[in-house]
Structures are given as C-alpha cells and as structure tokens.
Amino acid sequence: MKRIISLLLALALAFSLTACTAPAEKADGGKLQIVTTLFPYYDFARAIVGDRADVTLLLSPGREAHSFEPTPIDAVTISEADVFLYNGGEGEYWVDSMLDAAGENIAVVARMMDYVDALDEEYVEGMQGADGHDHDHEHGSHDDHDDHDHDHEEDEHDSDEVEYDEHIWTSPKNAVVLCRAVCDAICKADPANEDFYRANCDGYCAQIEALDARFAALCESAPHKLLVFADRFPMLYFCREFGLDYRAAFHGCSGDTEPSLATIKYLIDKVEDEDIPVVYTIDFGTKKVAAVVSECTGAAVDTLYSMQTVSRADFDAGETYLTLMERNYEALRKGLNE
C-alpha cells in the first residue's frame, strides 16, 4: 500500500510539472523557498533565515507524524522548493518517489539522518514486543558522508533493512549538528546571504549548547537515572547522550497504543520497585496507560516533548525547539530529583 501511495503521488507531481510550459514567477518576489518535513528542521530554518526566506512545514501542526501521508498538493509544494529538508528513514518512505518526480527542480536537498550516527530501535525489558528481540545487539550507524550536499543525486540508503530510531534531534548535541547542516544547505542555495545565515545559526546553536550543559548537569547530579514511559519512547538519543536508563510500553516508532496486561504490570512493578516519582507520556501520545500506572502507584504523570510535530496551539504561540526542550528540562527535573 505504501508503494502504491508513493507512485500515485509521484505521478500526480510529474503531471503537474509537465503541465507547466514555463517556470512560474514566485509570488513573493523571489524569496528563497524552504520546505521541511518535520518541526525541528522548520524551527532551525526559520531561526537561521529570519525574514529573508519563506519556510514551510509540510507536516502541519496537530497532525500525527507516524500516520502522515503526503497529498498531491504537498508533492507540488516540495517540487517548488529551493531547499528541501527531510529526516529520512522508514517514516518518510515516500520522499524518494517525490524527489525522482521533481527531478532537478529542487536546488538543494538534505537528508538529516546522514549527518549524525543513527541508533537501532531498541526493545528493552518489559517493552511490548521485547520477547522477540535481542536486547544486546550492536547499535548501527549510517556510513560517514564526506559530502552532504545532495544536489538531488541518486542516493542509496538503508539497504540492509536495519530499523533505525528516527528521533535524532532529541539529543541536543545532535540538534547542534543538524542546525548547522540546515544552515549549510540554505547557504548553498543562497550564498549572497551566507554571512547573515551563519551568524544566526551560531547564535541559535549557542543557545542549544547552553541548554545542553544544563541537561548534563541535571542528569549528572540526579539521585537516580531511570525514566519510565507509559507510552512510546522517542527519546533514545536524548537518554543515550545523558546516560539515562529507561523502560517504556513501546519503542519510538511503534504504531501500537494498547499494551498487553504483562507490559502494564511490568511498568507498575518497576515504578513501585524503583520508587519512581514521575511516569512520562509524550506529546501526541496516549495518556490511558500512564493514568493506570499512576492510579496503581501514586506516581505523578508528566509529558516529554519529542517535537516531531507540535500542536496547533504551540505552533501559533511561536514555540521553538528551545522552549519545548525547556519544558522537557522542567519535567525531567521533577522526575530525576524528587
């Protein structure tokens, strides 16, 4: 079904491109057009360009990223971009067919998972489906890339069928690398404004690095380092950076929402045995399991933001990667120090 959807979208895009006899003038008078699939890259891009480019978020606020299917309108939006920034991985299986159909229309394409070491999805003790997986496997990473400027050349990705965790931006150290990769792509498309873009990028990265240092100090001094998620677990990169252990109902990209009774019992027992003060859910996650665990254990419930997407209210309020990570800091402070 996924392959059929991709082909249909590609055909729709190809038709829309061949129907145009000449390139249309940009309605905004020539501003650089940047299209991103996910919120973190949208946020990095808008912080870098200010008012000198237009940034479009393909995954509209409030939409669940794991069930996102692009429309023909989305395909045309991608084809009209000067810079296209996407995450990569199985969650964006449809991108390759979009880019094939767009041809050379897009000046710069950047796949964000190429810029950091990708980690395998993990199945830890107690997690739904963990019985069928080896907990001690090696964590793979993508091959290093000397040249990250795709220019829409044909790439080969993930041919070994490894299932990677795609939430790479949840590590602040990764976020700095990704923000700079976004800046590089934008500067390549618009070198006339490079000094402006790089100055903005440096300023934003400095703020992420300052927050990263606060997280490091918090986690280093914490009396315990175990987080319990009664939900999906999209924070693998964050926990790996800061040396935190975790238990969760589902892995990060799971489509499941109803854990088995054995998984629920495991989480309840773990919270009681380890005297865990806070059970976590995630933005756009189910709250039902956390409510059950909380009722049985007395633990509080709080939310950690994976930021793959954001709510309409947060988007309209101008929330950023930094402000949402600040919420995460406060939620973790309660869970690690109480």
Which positions does each model-derived feature cover?
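Extracytoplasmic metal-acquisition and chelation regions
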Residues: 7-9, 20-338
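Hydrophobic membrane-targeting signal helices
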Residues: 14-19
